[in-house]
Amino acid sequence: MLMFLTHFAEHVTPFNVFRYITFRTGGAMITSALIVFLFGPTIINSLRVRQGKGQPIRADGPQTHFKKAGTPTMGGLMIMTGILASCLLWANLASVYVWVVLMVSVGFGAIGFYDDYLKVTKQSDKGFSGKARLGIEFLIAAIAAFTIMRAGQEPFSSSLTFPFVKQLVINLSWFFILFAAFVMVGAGNAVNLTDGLDGLAIVPVMVAAASFGFIAYLSGNAIFADYLQIHFVPGTGELAVVLGAVIGAGLGFLWFNAPPAAIFMGDTGSLALGGMLGTVAVATKHEIVLAIIGGLFVMEALSVIIQVGFFKMTGRRVFLMAPIHHHFEKKGWTESQVVIRFWIVAIILAMIGLSTLKLR
C-alpha cells in the first residue's frame, strides 16, 4: 500500500524511501511485531474463554506436559494477523509472488484452524482426517506451483537447481508442479510436527525466514544473482518484505509463547508458516537449500516417518517417542534443554544453508 506513495516521489522526495526493499522489510518487521504485541493479550483472553479446556494434552506424552492443560491454542491467528496487516501496508501488492505466498499461508492456516477447532471441541488429538487434510493441502500447493511456474522465465521456471554446483539444472517440465507441491506440503507438515514444546517451532521458523529473506533479496537482484551464480528470479526480492513480517510476528508471538506458554501456536500457525517457507523456497528456486536451512524440521518429520514405518513392519519403536523432541524428553532432557539445543541446531543449519550461495 505504501508503495503507492512512490508515484508522488517526484514532488515529495522522502517518498522515494518506499522503493527500497530493505527499508520496507524493516518496516514490515516492526509493524507485525507491534500488532502482535498490542492485540496479543486480547486474542489470548478471547481464545481462553471460547476454548475452555484449551488444547488437549497427549495421554502418552511426558508427565511434565500435563501442567499445560488449559492453555489455549490457535495462536497462529495472532501471527497471521500481524503478517497479513503488515504485508498489506509494506509489500508491493502488484507482485504475484507476494499473493501466491500469502494464498498458500492463509489456505494452510485455514486447514490448521479447522483441525485445531476439532481437537478443542472434541478434546481429542484426533482432528481433521489426515487424507482429506493432505488432499486439500496438495490442491492449494498445486495451484500455487502452477502460478509460480507461469510467472517465471522459461525455461528456468520449471527447473530444479542444486546447491554447491553452478551449472547443474534439471528441467522438470510439468512434473515441477508435483515436486513443488510436495515441497510446500512437506514444509507445512514438518513445521507442524516440530511445534510440540514452548518456543520450539517459532524460533527456527524465524531463523529460516531470515535466511530465505536474504536469499529472496539476492535472487531478485540481477547484479547479486549474477555475482553468486544463482538463478535471477525477477520479483522475488519482494518476498523479503513478507518474511520480514514473519520475523516480527514471530518475535511478538514468542513473547507470549515463552515458557510457561500463555498460548500455543497450534496447527493454525505451524501449517501456515511452514507452507509459506516452502512456497518461498519454490519461488526462489532454492527448494533443496530449504532442506538444509530447515533441517531441524526435516529431522522432526523423518523421526515420525521412521517411527511409524518401523512399528508397522516390526511392532517395535526406534525412538522412545516421536517426534524426536519428545524422545529427548523421555531420555531425561528438560524441556528448556531440548528447545534451546534445537534452536542452536537450527542456527547452525541455517549458516550451512546460506554458505551454499557462495560455495559453488
Curated annotation (Swiss-Prot):
It is found in: Cell inner membrane. GO terms for biological process: cell division; cell wall organization; peptidoglycan biosynthetic process; regulation of cell shape. Its EC number is 2.7.8.13. Its cofactor is Mg(2+). The chain crosses the membrane at residues 27-47, 71-91, 93-113, 128-148, 168-188, 199-219, 239-259, 262-282, 288-308, 337-357. Keywords: Cell cycle, Cell division, Cell inner membrane, Cell membrane, Cell shape, Cell wall biogenesis/degradation, Magnesium, Membrane, Metal-binding, Peptidoglycan synthesis, Transferase, Transmembrane, Transmembrane helix. Pathway: Cell wall biogenesis; peptidoglycan biosynthesis. It comes from the Bacteria. Its main location: membrane. It catalyses: UDP-N-acetyl-alpha-D-muramoyl-L-alanyl-gamma-D-glutamyl-meso-2,6-diaminopimeloyl-D-alanyl-D-alanine + di-trans,octa-cis-undecaprenyl phosphate = di-trans,octa-cis-undecaprenyl diphospho-N-acetyl-alpha-D-muramoyl-L-alanyl-D-glutamyl-meso-2,6-diaminopimeloyl-D-alanyl-D-alanine + UMP. GO terms for molecular function: metal ion binding; phospho-N-acetylmuramoyl-pentapeptide-transferase activity; UDP-N-acetylmuramoyl-L-alanyl-D-glutamyl-meso-2,6-diaminopimelyl-D-alanyl-D-alanine:undecaprenyl-phosphate transferase activity. It is a multi-pass membrane protein. Catalyzes the initial step of the lipid cycle reactions in the biosynthesis of the cell wall peptidoglycan: transfers peptidoglycan precursor phospho-MurNAc-pentapeptide from UDP-MurNAc-pentapeptide onto the lipid carrier undecaprenyl phosphate, yielding undecaprenyl-pyrophosphoryl-MurNAc-pentapeptide, known as lipid I. NCBIfam families: mraY. Belongs to the glycosyltransferase 4 family. MraY subfamily. This is Phospho-N-acetylmuramoyl-pentapeptide-transferase.
